[in-house]
Amino acid sequence: MDKIVLEGCRFYGYHGAYKEEQTLGQIFLVDLELSVDLQAASLSSQLTDTVHYGMVFDSVRQLVEGEKFILIDGLAGAICEQLFNEFPPIEAIKVAIKKENPPIAGHYKAVGIELERQR
């Protein structure tokens, strides 16, 4: 299956189980892998034959920056649901969401989740 990839999308949001996360907010890193049949687009080179990744980015940004979730698992599920609803050609989605600086003690590069959904 062909893929459209958006990697390292950075958004500021207020998601998390800790009160500090819900009031102060933080940066969220979102990676998306969209399974889409790109055969027609590869032959026509027309935007109408594919999923516009700029529109995907805007859709995800509106959700991450405009809503609040206690768990990023819920945010990831909502991203999948919204993208399936807005972009019918998407057959499957892999989404990873990471927090670089959650309010937990320790040394790490990031914490996060990854999930995959199919129509």
UniProtKB/Swiss-Prot annotation:
Its EC number is 4.1.2.25. CDD domains: DHNA_DHNTPE. The active site is at 99 (proton donor/acceptor). Substrate binds at residues 21, 53, 72-73. Pfam families: FolB. GO terms for biological process: folic acid biosynthetic process; tetrahydrofolate biosynthetic process. Transmembrane segments: none annotated. PANTHER family: DIHYDRONEOPTERIN ALDOLASE 1-RELATED (PTHR42844:SF1). Belongs to the DHNA family. Catalyzes the conversion of 7,8-dihydroneopterin to 6-hydroxymethyl-7,8-dihydropterin. This is Dihydroneopterin aldolase. The gene is folB.
